[in-house]
Amino acid sequence: MTATLRRDGALALVYLAATWLTAAVFMGDTLYYADSVLGMTGGRITPATFDPRGNYSFFEFGHLLWRPVGWLCYLAFGALARRLCGGDARQAAVFLLVALNWAAGLCCVLLLRRVLGYVARREWVIVTAAVGFTCAYAFLNFTQSGSSYVPALALYLAGLLVLLRGGERVTKPLRTALGAGVCFAGAVCLWFLYVWAVPAALAAPLVLFGDDVRRRRLFVYGALVSGGLTVLLYVGAVVGGLHLTQLAQVKAWVASSGHGLDNNRGVLQVVFGLARTFLSVGRDNVLFKRFLLHDPYNPVTAFDLVRLSLWKLALFYLAAGAAGLLLLGEGRGRRVLVLLLLGAGPVLLFAALWQGTPPERYLPLYPVAFMALACALDAERRRAPLKTVLLAFVLALVCVNAAALSTAALGRRQAAMSARTAELVPLLKSQSVVVEVKEELKDLQWEFPFHPLNRVLTVYSAVSIGDAESARWREAFARRATEAWAAGGDVWLSRRLLEPRPRAASYWVEGSDPGITWAQVNAFFGQFEQGQAVGDADGFVLLARTPRNENALRALVSSP
């Protein structure tokens, strides 16, 4: 067995152990993708299907090829997946999407090890950086989800490696550009945000190996191939798939990829979100919002943040500063620092303009970030304190994220949800709906899609903070409740809706949407007549189907 295979095998074992001992705590839009795959298979969705919110479009602007890839996978392996999932088609589709991500994640780790070899010489440095990458929060989480982020990252890393191999000594620039360009186009078509990271990858040979005519030619060829193929695929989807012929229709399609979200932008969101993509903060992001917005129900002090969360942010930015100082100390490091700025700058700018806190937003800068980490650790100058900070950061990546995503911790969360709904489940009809606001039951469906409760429990969040249509949350609830009644189901309300203040353990942050207050939510649900109650003080009450309740809900449904 060669040394390369031994090293690959060791990193593969690290990846296997990391994903065996942990699970995703945030699955993104996995269920939307699974439902789209099943809809396409069953004929309910066609390539021309356009959802104004982007959730069920077969060709979605932000993830153009992910649903088609999932659909083809389901056609090939759906029967086997259904047998493994007890005949549940939805869980089978989720299983296949997660399997694709897991395989892509393994490819990412092995590809990154080779990429790091171009900026670091010591094997222990390369392994340390690769282990840190494996355990970084966004990667470790989403490699176990059904979203497209990690497969896109794998293609991006493959394209970067092709360019570095062909760009060190340029002999066949067109062939190299074709290989890299196909990979980059695939990455962008799986997740459009990689478009902000591709220019840095194209420039990598010029930055790392020096400027010459052949590398400039490679840059131009790569840009033409990746850009041209991306445009060709998008035009094909718009014209041949969606059959959009007017500019206004195309604009609406592009806008639908925002999924109706309209806030969460700004520099502060980037400061928090960038650190969060590497180190899990759990629910600390809720505490951070409560502190910034001076939540009157669940106030958070600066001391609370320091004690619970800010040390992680401090460690991240301390490590970033240490890496910067080490990179500035030698010529190779300065070149890597330039590449880091080229790769991170556009990603950070876009995050400041739209949705800066989600951890997946920063996955496109992972390759250059860990290249910078490896190069800094590999620096020739002996600056032990700075390197100690970097090693402490890598250790924190392993320990903090392994604890946050551990299967044991997530199992306890699921057990608590099961216990809370134990008395409710036997009373649920197939069309019944359980209503809550910013609570954990919705997590059961979206973050733990294989949990057996998902086969009997349909959860509706009465208010979606940050949604462009959140101002009409009353009308949306009325519509959902009347639909459940018309289908023969019941509507159950979480008792937490009827409490005068949101619980500290909830996700509610007063002021995160200026147009919605807890007092409004509490007063709205408190006006309805109630029926049977189940469980303890943290249980559920039946929304009684009385003439008074029906009239109130019908009035809301018919309101303009």
Which role does the model predict for each range below?
Residues 1, 13, 291-334:
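Hydrophobic, aromatic-rich transmembrane alpha-helices
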Residues 11-15, 128-129, 224, 315-322, ...:
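Transmembrane alpha-helix segments characteristic
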Residues 129-130, 175-192, 202-203, 348:
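Membrane-interface alpha helices of multi-pass inner-membrane proteins
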Residues 138-151, 358-359:
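Short acidic/glycine- and proline-prone juxtamembrane loop motifs at membrane-interface regions
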Residues 165-169, 196-231, 235, 239, ...:
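Perimembrane helix-loop-helix junctions
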Residues 174, 182, 223-228, 332, ...:
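Signature aromatic-anchored transmembrane alpha helix within multi-pass, membrane-resident enzymes
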Residues 397-448, 456:
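Membrane-embedded, lumen/periplasm-facing catalytic core of multi-pass transferases
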Residues 429, 436-438, 450-549, 554-555:
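Luminal/periplasmic acceptor-recognition loop/helix of membrane-associated glycosyltransferases
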